[in-house]
Amino acid sequence: KPNATREDGSDGWYNYRELARELIPWLLDHRFTHVELLPLAEHPFDGSWGYQTTGYFSVTSRYGTPAQFAGFVNACHRMGIGVIMDFVPVHFAANADALAKFDGTYLYEYDSDVGQSEWGTCNFNYYRREVCSFLSSAAGLWMDVYHCDGIRMDAISRALYWQGDPNRGVNQGAVNFLRSLNHGLNERWPTGIYMAEDSTNFLKVTAPTRYEGVGFDYKWDMGWMHDTLDYFATPFGERPGCYGKLLFSMHYFYNELYLLALSHDEVVHGKKTIIDKLWGTYEEKCAQLRTLYFYMYTHPGKKLNFMGNELGHFREWDEKKELDWGLMKYPFHDSFQKYFAELGRLYATEPALYDGEYNPNCFEWIACESRDEGVYAWLRKGAGQTILCVMNTQNTAHKKFPLYLSFPAGAEELLNTEAPCWGCLLYTSPS
């Protein structure tokens, strides 16, 4: 099935009831299948975005009551939207009124240097069965009590390896815990979606536990994200030298079940927003943003986007402020959110874009050596259908560009990124 998720940082502007009223129609209009919520377990520091948890069995009271949160989940379900909860099983807030030195000793955390994370939080000790049981129960709460449809687990690379450093070796206790957790979740809620934020090369993260895998359903493709954003941030004249960045993901894509994520981490801390990372003038950024998302939605793998990406948001995310909805009065930003919705519609209605996406026989490069022209072309296949995807990443048009197919084919245009309906300000060769 197609899966396009919107990551949502519920930041205090709406309570759970208001969020249901405002958010769900937007999700439907833009063809999202799921909404992923940043951690809603209780936490004291707004600036942690929920990733420094103190109350693992408490829904934060910032946005309403537990019953109101359950109502939000039910409202999403009535409209066919799944809810994925962000869960933090690796580290917890160092606050004295929470789990840190809970009984005056290192009860939940390690008692050595590995007990402290890079964020100043405490790392869970997976070699204590009581701690593993605590975390498994906390994860199950979201599925059992609130009927969430899946869990995204944060900072898994910091669990798989000691301090997230492969040079320090594998943390076998953490690996065993994650296997047990995923096995238990899949046993009890087999239709749930369980995904890992993991930037390491650890093997079999998405392999079933019965095959000695860690048992996640999906793993964020951090390599695809970095290479894609690096390429589109490169000046046009220098792009021939890094042409391979947009090819590399398909060299390893079938090693795991990858999900393509442009998340909250990419639009904060001076990194700039997605559109603002792109090279060029305002007009060139606008044209390239359509191309980048064309590439994302036609590349194999499920999709995840942080809120605001669909607006072409220029200001970095600030948990103290709402999104710049005033952008919608500008032609490009209004047309881009409609373009984003059209990509979602195309993804949901063209089976070749999701059927067999983890089958290497369902993808084929057609043009992957056009370094100077900046052109890429590939086939997506599935459900008896074949879609040809062509992308020009340079700022010059190609009136003619030969492509050779191994079979006779007619052609129907499904999407043109430079069509007038998208409010184009600059003509480039269409994707």
Label every model-predicted segment.
Residues 1-116, 128-132, 159, 170-185, ...:
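Acidic/aromatic-lined carbohydrate-recognition and catalytic surfaces
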Residues 28, 143-144, 297:
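Non-catalytic positions within long, well-ordered alpha-helices that form the structural scaffold/packing
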Residues 37, 76, 142, 153, ...:
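Conserved, mostly hydrophobic/aromatic
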Residues 147-149, 161-320, 348, 354-403, ...:
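Conserved alpha/beta catalytic core and glycan-binding cleft of carbohydrate-active enzymes
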Residues 335-352:
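Catalytic cores of secreted or luminal carbohydrate-active enzymes
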Residues 418-426:
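Acidic, Ser/Thr/Pro-rich beta/coil linker or hinge segments at domain junctions
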Residues 427-431:
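Conserved small/polar residues in nucleotide/adenosyl-binding loops
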